[in-house]
């Protein structure tokens, strides 16, 4: 068990609050096959990054706007199996609403659709791909999130599940909790995660005065990916 003090929490969404793994894999695999690309490679690259970045990487000479719109439309339509990760709803409900934000690589429209489908509350403070010029792994999304909650990034804790997001949080100056929900633990550690836990069920709000005091359980359960 570890005790962490911070001023605010900045959550990634997919892989942290919402289990959209299968939907993401279906959409990006289909797109990869259509363009003669390796589906596994594309799916892995797409996690935690703005969809436009992945489109540009794999189709440098393609119609980026059209392909990105195609991806987003399919993602908004494919909600099968989409659920909240264990502990996500309880943790969000326990936190003061002005002390947490969602910082996601999704567009606002897609993020809102997925939050509704998963039964999670819409945050008071929302940073999406539409709000920044440079997405993760650049620090811009988390710098904007920290500014929006009213604290320096160094006083915030980022909760992430993939290397691109962890690097973004660290580059912004925040501490980062990595979740074992999407990639192997060594990838989280190599990206710079300060603590690694199974999922949001392993993060609890112990007290709230001027600062949030969190308790995190870094022990790995046998059934998790690591």
Regions found by a protein language model. Give the residues of each.
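Asp-based, Mg2+/Mn2+-dependent phosphohydrolase catalytic module
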Residues: 1-7, 99, 108-226
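N-terminal helical cap/lid subdomain that shapes the substrate entry/recognition surface
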Residues: 2-99, 107-109, 120
């Amino acid at each position: 068990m570890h005790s962490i003090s911070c001023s605010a929490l900045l959550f990634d969404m997919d892989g942290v609050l919402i289990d959209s793994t299968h939907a993401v894999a279906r959409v990006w695999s289909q797109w990869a096959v259509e363009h003669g690309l390796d589906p596994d490679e594309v799916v892995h690259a797409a996690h935690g990054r703005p969809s436009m970045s992945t489109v540009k990487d794999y189709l440098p000479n393609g119609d980026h706007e059209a392909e990105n719109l195609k991806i987003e439309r399919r993602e908004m339509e494919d909600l099968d199996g989409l659920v909240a990760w264990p502990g996500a709803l309880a943790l969000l409900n326990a936190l003061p609403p002005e002390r947490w934000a969602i910082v996601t690589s999704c567009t606002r429209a897609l993020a809102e659709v997925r939050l509704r489908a998963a039964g999670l509350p819409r945050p008071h403070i929302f940073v999406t791909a539409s709000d920044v010029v440079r997405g993760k792994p650049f620090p811009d999304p988390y710098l904007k999130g920290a500014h929006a909650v009213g604290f320096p990034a160094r006083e915030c804790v980022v909760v992430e599940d993939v290397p691109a997001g962890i690097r973004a949080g660290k580059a912004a100056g925040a501490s980062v909790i990595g979740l074992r929900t999407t990639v192997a633990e060594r990838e989280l550690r190599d990206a710079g995660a300060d603590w690694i836990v199974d999922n949001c069920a392993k993060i609890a709000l112990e007290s709230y005065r001027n600062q949030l005091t969190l308790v995190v359980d870094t022990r790995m359960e046998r059934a998790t990916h690591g």
